[in-house]
Amino acid sequence: MRIANIPSDRRAVFAHNDPADLARCLEAVPEGVGRVIVIFDGIFSMRGDAAPLQDLLRVTAAHDHRFRDGVITMMDDSHGIGAYGATGRGTEEHAGARVDIFIGTFGKAFGVNGGFVAGSPTLIEAVRQKADTYIYTNPLGAADAAAAVAAINIADSDEGRARLAHLAARTLQFRAGLAALGLESIPGPHPVVPLLVRSTDTVRAMVQGLFERGILAVGLTFPVVPKGDETIRFQINAAHTEADIADALDALKALTQSPASR
């Protein structure tokens, strides 16, 4: 939004994952506007919650007729692609629905520099010819491109399916362990798992305590998240073992149930 330099009277922000608020925003678009673009995340990076894609698309479809070029949907699924959906194809696969413009990265599930924009041939040619953020930029290096292709081929193989199933099992193990400890999280199958701590000092102390026990987790405090939503973000990956997850849960038990933590 900042790079596009869209005037404030030509844009609106709808509430997080809220189809009703999206409908309100679309209803407020004045007559005469030729095109509306609705942009959202497939997986919200801070909390691992998924967009209600089918519900959002039902709203955009209901308003499509009002605009000459319709309502164009754009989804950034950087945290979904490779790690979410039955075969790792992300939020679209999980929801059984498609957006017009699909944005992703090779830097998360695939472990390589670079990213991509997917859409119709006409759209991609328009990006090549007209996108200020693309024109005169350097292409992806040959080594990164080859590594991305190799990673995608692994993900789209029997080995990749096995890794994805293992990732889902370890994610379920960790989420179930948090619940058993009485710790607050946000439900969902995604391997980004938030632990809602709701205290800056406690987040910092727990992140340090985890690090001292050989566990790397990211603390999120104000202004990255609103006050009262202080969180520790855990990222489960396909290399984690059942024992790794058990160790992390044991560390959390020690940190949250010791007298010093009360």
Predicted regions and their residues:
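Pyridoxal 5′-phosphate
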Residues: A15-L22, V36-V38, R66-R68, S78, ...
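Active-site PLP attachment segment
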Residues: E93-A126
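PLP-dependent enzyme catalytic core of the Aspartate aminotransferase-like
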Residues: E212-L216, V224-R262
